[in-house]
A protein has these predicted regions:
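Flexible, processing/modification-adjacent segments and terminal tails
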Residues: 41, 100-166, 190-194, 247-253
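Short, hydrophobic/aromatic-rich segments at coil-to-beta transitions
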Residues: 59-65, 78-84, 145-153, 179-181, ...
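C-terminal motif of bacterial Sec signal peptides marking the signal peptidase cleavage site
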Residues: 12-15
Length: 253
């Protein structure tokens, strides 16, 4: 009798555990479905992110660093704290405010608030176009050397960033889904929406720990229809890329 009671208890316990596992499994599946549904970007842009290593790999990364000329630009990808180091000056964002430190006053030419994350955005394409507070709109393709490149316009909701009226348009290869062009407006000074787009060609890419990041970009001139024609200036080259899942101390920024 005692053995029978113990057996019944054991069966009950095992049954409860199995039910708990099923319930846990259902919750995990529901969570996975919920996470998929959270994505706000269009399916085509999801393919662009995938062509560049995948949005999940990007989100796991903690630190991104690269060189532009004599500047070393380092970013905490989760907080978006940034440091731009040069032999004669440093500037950045510590999570609260933009700062500038110079060996000699006037060494840095430009506006720190405008410049501190400018090249981070150009370099972190296309992944920064998955940030929160973004609206997407399919736009007409642009044409260059016989190829039409489909595009999506990216605009920001009010009070997102220092220039919420800035707009971006990403153009991608229709076959490989690799990003090819970026059109963007600048509203930092005017604080008003603009339809004047600058155009950048992403010439070369490289694999950095599984993520496909830019190695060289070139600003282009456009015709009246908005299609690229010829380079407007020499190429900008990025070197010594690093992306890591290890965080840097807050004091670094």
């Amino acid at each position: 009798m005692k053995k029978l009671i113990l057996l019944l208890i054991a069966i009950t316990v095992i049954s409860c555990k199995n039910e708990a596992k099923k319930e846990s499994s259902k919750k995990e599946e529901a969570q996975e479905i919920k996470e998929v549904k959270k994505e706000k970007f269009p399916e085509e842009l999801g393919k662009v992110f995938q062509a560049h290593g995948g949005i999940n790999a990007w989100r796991k990364a903690q630190v991104l660093s690269f060189n532009k000329g004599e500047e070393v630009i380092t970013t905490d990808l989760q907080s978006r704290k940034i440091v731009v180091n040069h032999s004669k000056y440093s500037l950045g964002f510590d999570g609260k405010e933009v700062w500038l430190s110079e060996d000699e006053k006037g060494t840095f030419k430009g506006n720190p608030e405008f410049y501190y994350n400018l090249y981070f955005y150009f370099y972190a394409m296309p992944f920064v176009l998955s940030d929160d507070g973004i609206a997407y709109e399919k736009v007409d393709a642009i044409s260059f050397e016989g190829t039409d490149f489909p595009g999506y316009k990216i605009s920001y909701k009010a009070n997102v960033g220092t220039s919420p009226d800035d707009n971006y348009i990403i153009y991608y290869n229709p076959t490989s889904y690799q990003m090819e062009w970026l059109a963007y407006t600048v509203t930092f000074n005017s604080k008003e929406p603009s339809e004047k787009y600058n155009l950048i060609k992403y010439n070369k890419w490289e694999n950095v720990n599984g993520l496909i990041l830019p190695q060289e970009i070139t600003w282009f001139k456009k015709d009246d229809a908005g299609n690229p024609t010829e380079p407007a200036r020499p190429a900008t080259v990025f070197t010594l890329p690093l992306i890591s899942q290890a965080k840097l101390a807050d004091s670094f920024y």
